[in-house]
């Protein structure tokens, strides 16, 4: 296929057009008074969002050269989202500002490579200054503020995220689901829960709630199917003598074995319940081992030479309480040794770092949290499906932002931190004048997020930016109320990781785009050439 090629200013102006189209659509969502974007869907209701990366991902341009520019800025938003979970709109605004000023400098005859070096030098220095300005985010109040800001000033969402982090710890697993009602609720599952219920309703002990409740049970963990009751008899006899209930977790319990367990349970000979082990294949083996670690038991597996007929009481795990319904099993207060549990959690964390799959990472994080202390589920409530999706996006953003804040601390929000960093770096110089221009391009761009927030409020950006520049420390502009003051005291804070990631990714892609001299794409195919008429088939004449 033949190619279309553009050089120099021709290529750069097309690329800038694409950047501007995407950035203009994204940046109207920035700040507390940012507007919504409505996205048409090929099925279902349109999506309403204020999430920068969601808007960016929807944009594809007809002109292939413009589209290349748009896709590169889309990459800025995606990378920032992957690294920090928020700050995608800020990153897009920064990238647009650096690219626009940088391309003007190239058109004026500056050396693109020196401009890039100047920009890179500035960003490196700015990241170091951001870390100095950062303050730790450890208390519940600060976490609430970060969540509130990231959820578009929705205090309810900030409060719920802070409560969730309080319950399961800063590193605990917090998942977001669509709720059934109008209110957003927090559901905390203490202990280890997995999505397997009882194998027979005849095991039920509480018919009102439809659950099996076992107090101080023994727990038998088996990595195979159990079909023959003879294998289970020694364990059942030992547990019956100890006058304790028994929970069996196995690949499956079927036929004669299941029927005998049900009969024993109904006659009151031994209180017992059987459930399938969670997961499949290697993941099932790993999760059985997790349960064994938590309950101080041993997984009975023929692979390591353990036979079910020789099981002793010492091989069984124990817990304070187990609650099982038709869908889930929850093990509360296993008696496992804390040092062994911590070692298992550390081992899983190493696997998370080594994993390249997002799905595997998510599953490993869930396993780690279940061992470490529980899972919190935020159930998002809304009146309509459209509102539900929009609100769920905001909760996801807020959750990522609070995690980032706990990780690297917080700085003054509303674009103020970057303005302060730019002021500190005013005296920065490069090796030549072209590098100095690159430094000035990056420093000017650092004001762009503040200016855009103010523009989205309908105020005069230059006046506000000038007032903020003249202030010191955390002094800034509260876009919600239109007042000036200490941003930290007003609760307007940004995670340092979000500000840092936005600046680094924006500058990285923008600097590369400034050094572009040639663009190549497939030449558009004419419609007539793309779909030739179907010829006649032998013996059938021409086809109409």
Swiss-Prot record:
What are this entry's molecular-function GO terms? ATP binding; ATP-dependent protein folding chaperone; isomerase activity; unfolded protein binding
Which residues of the sequence carry a binding annotation for ATP? 29-32, 50, 86-90, 414, 494
Gene Ontology biological-process annotations: protein refolding
Question: What EC identifiers does the entry list?
Answer: 5.6.1.7
Q: Which residues form a coiled coil?
A: none
What's an example GO cellular component term for this entry? cytoplasm
Quaternary structure annotation from Swiss-Prot or TrEMBL: Forms a cylinder of 14 subunits composed of two heptameric rings stacked back-to-back. Interacts with the co-chaperonin GroES.
* NCBIfam families tied to this protein: GroEL, PRK00013.1, PRK12849.1, PRK12850.1, PRK12851.1
Q: Record's family?
A: Belongs to the chaperonin (HSP60) family.
Q: What does this protein do?
A: Together with its co-chaperonin GroES, plays an essential role in assisting protein folding. The GroEL-GroES system forms a nano-cage that allows encapsulation of the non-native substrate proteins and provides a physical environment optimized to promote and accelerate protein folding.
What protein name applies here? Chaperonin GroEL 1
């Amino acid at each position: 296929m033949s190619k279309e090629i553009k050089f120099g200013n021709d290529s750069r102006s097309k690329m800038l057009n694409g950047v501007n189209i995407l950035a203009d659509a994204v940046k109207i969502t920035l700040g507390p008074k940012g507007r919504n974007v409505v996205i048409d869907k090929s099925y279902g209701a349109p999506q309403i969002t204020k999430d920068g990366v969601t808007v960016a991902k929807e944009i594809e341009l007809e002109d292939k050269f413009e589209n290349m520019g748009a896709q590169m800025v889309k990459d800025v938003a995606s990378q920032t989202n992957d690294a920090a979970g928020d700050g995608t709109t800020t990153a897009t605004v920064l990238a647009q500002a650096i690219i626009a000023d940088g391309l003007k400098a190239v058109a004026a005859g500056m050396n693109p490579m020196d401009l890039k070096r100047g920009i890179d030098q500035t960003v490196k220095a700015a990241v170091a200054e951001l870390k100095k300005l950062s303050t730790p985010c450890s208390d519940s109040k600060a976490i609430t503020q970060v969540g509130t800001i990231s959820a578009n000033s929705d205090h309810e969402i900030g409060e719920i995220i802070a409560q969730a982090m309080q319950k399961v710890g800063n590193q605990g697993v917090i998942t977001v689901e669509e709720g059934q009602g109008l209110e957003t609720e927090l559901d905390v599952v203490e202990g280890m829960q997995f999505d397997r219920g009882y194998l027979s309703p005849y095991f039920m002990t509480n018919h009102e709630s439809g659950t099996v409740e076992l107090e101080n049970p023994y727990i038998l963990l088996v990595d195979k199917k159990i079909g023959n009751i003879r294998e289970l008899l020694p364990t059942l006899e030992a547990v019956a003598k100890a006058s304790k209930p028994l929970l069996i977790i196995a690949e499956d319990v079927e036929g004669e074995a299941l029927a005998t367990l049900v009969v024993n349970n109904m006659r009151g000979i031994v209180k017992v319940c059987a459930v399938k082990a969670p997961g499949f294949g290697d993941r099932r083996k790993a999760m059985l081992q997790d349960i064994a670690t938590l309950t101080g038991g041993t997984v009975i597996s023929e692979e390591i030479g353990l036979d079910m007929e020789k099981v002793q009481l010492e091989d069984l795990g124990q817990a304070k309480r187990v609650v099982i319904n038709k869908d889930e099993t929850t093990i509360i207060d296993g008696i496992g040794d804390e040092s062994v549990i911590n070692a298992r959690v550390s081992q899983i964390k190493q696997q998370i770092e080594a994993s390249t799959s997002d799905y595997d990472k998510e599953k490993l994080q869930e396993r780690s949290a279940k061992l470490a202390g529980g899972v919190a589920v935020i159930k998002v409530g809304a009146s309509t499906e459209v509102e539900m999706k929009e609100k769920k996006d905001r909760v996801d953003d807020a959750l990522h932002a609070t995690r980032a804040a706990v990780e690297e601390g917080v700085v003054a929000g509303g674009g103020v931190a970057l303005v302060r960093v730019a002021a500190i770096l005013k005296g920065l110089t490069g090796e030549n004048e072209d590098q100095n221009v690159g430094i000035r391009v990056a420093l000017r761009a650092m004001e762009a997020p503040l200016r855009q927030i103010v523009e989205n409020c309908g105020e005069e950006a230059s006046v506000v930016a000038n007032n903020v520049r003249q202030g010191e420390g955390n002094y800034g502009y509260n876009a919600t109320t239109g007042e000036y003051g200490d941003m930290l005291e007003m609760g307007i804070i940004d995670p340092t990781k979000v500000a840092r990631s936005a600046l680094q990714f924006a500058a990285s892609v923008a600097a590369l785009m400034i050094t572009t001299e040639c663009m190549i794409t497939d030449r558009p195919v004419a419609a007539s050439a793309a779909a030739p008429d179907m010829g006649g088939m032998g013996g059938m004449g021409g086809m109409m």
